């Protein structure tokens, strides 16, 4: 006779069995690709997707949500379009598009997603997740620009000074030396790095040829600048979406250094290509177009990017309350850091009144305008002093430079005007002739070879000679010879009593006397 199981025993057995089962439910919102073309996918089923959220396809490729429509979302692909097809499944990640930043990135070449592309292996070190899109620091978390960022270029440091935390536009036609100014500025930070107070540089190459970027990285390595530089590259062959998000990756890396109390410089080369990439993506997403077929928010694209450059208040307790601060950075925040931006814009036939140039001019704190005519005449850097300006950099200029070069910008502008009139007149009064002679010689002093930044103390000494008429007896074609001999003489005889004092920003009577005596001695050979 079989043993019968009582009802009460059945319930206790079932209870024991159920207690041994552990289940975890994980919900994933999954959508389906309706259509894919030209780097953009339309996806159905992701009703709760957020703007700028990262999506993931079955094959591991990622996309970023840009359009939120009634029954589908438009996402830009961060990879080749041919790897995605209609009907593929895609899931939400719940993460806003971001880049993992670490100290190991210094000296490396990476793509906009933070992946190394220089063949030197994985990037090591503790990482911080920095969002690509982030609100700029509010006014309460900033302090005025009051610390100089020396470019090593005489014409810039004397007449259009740049301060840490400033946004200074470099604008001009193609092949006028825009990138050269930015690269010289990066190379000039070598002295800060050696002094133990580095300015970390991020060079963002947007839509350039891979060979051009490789040559540039090679130059930075030869000059020892890769020790404190990160190169972020999205080449012309990369999808438009990568070129569009590319500058935001550079800004996020710069913010990592800025928020941790250090100084950073980011070069966007160039934002014209980003604007074209954004126009392409927007038109494919069927957003309404405006002037020159750019979308209506093209101004906001550049303003929200460039406003992230700032000098942060030197109070850590206030800086920690900064808006939109990533959680991964909260315990690393220190005050007093800065992020300086040098955006580059390419003009067509010198037209600064076009849509994108006028937008970026109105966003930035000044512009360095380069002219093709000056470049072809041999004036390099080919800076048009008349319409180049630095609105806040004057407060950051060191006192000795301000004292020596205070009138240089006006003098050179007047010289350009008088020189134009002198072509129509056969006879000139002595004062006009003297002004033109001085202007020409100062123009020769401001010419500088590429990749040869000059320390600020040497700049002050040689510019004193130009602004105070000490080149009167030097022939025009010998001005650059005079400059070399003068600097060599100062280094040999007056390193401590002149150059070391000028480095501190002080210029006194003893320094002036030594400069004038050295200039007179060197000028004798030209009499």
Predicted regions, residues:
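Phosphate-binding/switch loop-helix module in NTP-utilizing enzymes
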Residues: 242-278, 330-331
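P-loop NTPase nucleotide-binding/switch module
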Residues: 88-90, 97, 101-104, 117-167, ...
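Loop/turn-to-beta-strand initiation segments
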Residues: 198-200, 227-230, 261-265, 336-341
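Acidic-enriched and Gly/Ser
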Residues: 2-17, 23-26, 32-149
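Phosphate-interacting basic helix/loop segments used at nucleotide- and nucleic-acid interfaces
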Residues: 13-24, 151-156, 250, 305, ...
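Walker A/P-loop NTP-binding active-site region of P-loop NTPases
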Residues: 164-215, 270
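Nucleotide-state-sensitive switch-loop elements of NTP-binding domains
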Residues: 199, 209-253, 284-295, 302-307, ...
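Conserved catalytic/coupling modules of large nucleotide/cofactor-utilizing molecular machines
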Residues: 256, 273, 280-527
């Amino acid at each position: 006779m079989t043993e019968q199981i009582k009802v009460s025993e059945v319930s206790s057995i079932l209870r024991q069995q159920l207690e041994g089962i552990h289940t975890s439910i994980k919900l994933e919102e999954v959508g389906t690709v309706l259509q894919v073309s030209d780097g953009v996918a339309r996806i159905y089923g992701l009703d709760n997707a957020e703007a700028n959220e990262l999506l993931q396809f079955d094959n591991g490729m990622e996309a970023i949500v840009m359009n939120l429509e009634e029954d589908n979302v438009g996402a830009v692909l961060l990879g080749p379009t041919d790897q995605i097809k209609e009907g593929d499944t895609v899931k939400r990640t719940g993460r806003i598009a971001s880049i993992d930043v670490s100290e190991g990135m210094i000296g490396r070449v990476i793509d906009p997603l933070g992946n190394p592309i220089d063949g030197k292996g994985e990037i090591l070190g503790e990482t911080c997740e920095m969002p690509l899109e982030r609100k700029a620091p509010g006014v309460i978390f900033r302090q005025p620009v009051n610390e100089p960022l020396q470019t090593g270029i005489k014409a810039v440091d004397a007449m259009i000074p740049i301060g840490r935390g400033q946004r200074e536009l470099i604008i001009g036609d193609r092949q006028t030396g825009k990138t050269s100014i930015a690269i010289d500025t990066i190379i000039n930070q070598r002295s800060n790095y050696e002094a133990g107070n580095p300015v970390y540089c991020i060079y963002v190459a947007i839509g350039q040829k891979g060979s051009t970027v490789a040559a540039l990285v090679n130059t930075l390595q030869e000059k020892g600048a890769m020790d404190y530089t990160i190169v972020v590259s999205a080449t012309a062959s990369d999808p438009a979406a990568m070129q569009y998000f590319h500058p935001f990756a550079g800004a996020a890396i710069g913010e990592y250094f800025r928020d941790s109390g250090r100084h950073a410089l980011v070069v966007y080369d160039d934002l014209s290509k980003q604007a074209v990439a954004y126009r392409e993506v927007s038109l494919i997403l069927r957003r309404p177009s405006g002037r020159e077929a750019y979308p209506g928010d093209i101004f906001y694209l550049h303003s929200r990017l460039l406003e992230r450059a700032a000098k942060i208040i030197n109070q850590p307790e206030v800086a920690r309350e900064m808006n939109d601060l990533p959680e991964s950075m909260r315990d690393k925040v220190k005050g007093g850091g800065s992020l300086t931006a040098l955006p580059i814009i390419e003009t067509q036939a010198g037209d600064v009144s076009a849509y994108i140039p006028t937008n970026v001019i109105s966003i930035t704190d000044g512009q360095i305008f380069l002219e093709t005519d000056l470049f072809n005449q041999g004036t390099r850097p080919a800076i048009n002093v008349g319409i180049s300006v630095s609105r806040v950099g004057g407060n950051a200029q060191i006192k000795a430079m301000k004292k020596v070069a205070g009138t240089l910008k006006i003098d050179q502008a007047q010289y350009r005007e008088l020189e134009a009139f002198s072509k129509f007149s056969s006879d000139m009064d002595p004062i006009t002739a003297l002004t033109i002679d001085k202007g020409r010689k100062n123009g020769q002093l401001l010419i500088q070879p590429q990749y040869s930044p000059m320390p600020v103390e040497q700049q002050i000494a040689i510019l004193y000679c130009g602004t105070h008429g000490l080149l009167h007896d030097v022939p025009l074609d010998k001005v650059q010879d005079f400059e070399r001999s003068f600097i060599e003489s100062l280094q040999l005889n007056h390193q401590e009593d002149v150059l070391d004092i000028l480095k501190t920003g002080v210029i006194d009577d003893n320094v002036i006397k030594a400069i004038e005596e050295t200039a007179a001695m060197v000028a004798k050979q030209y009499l």
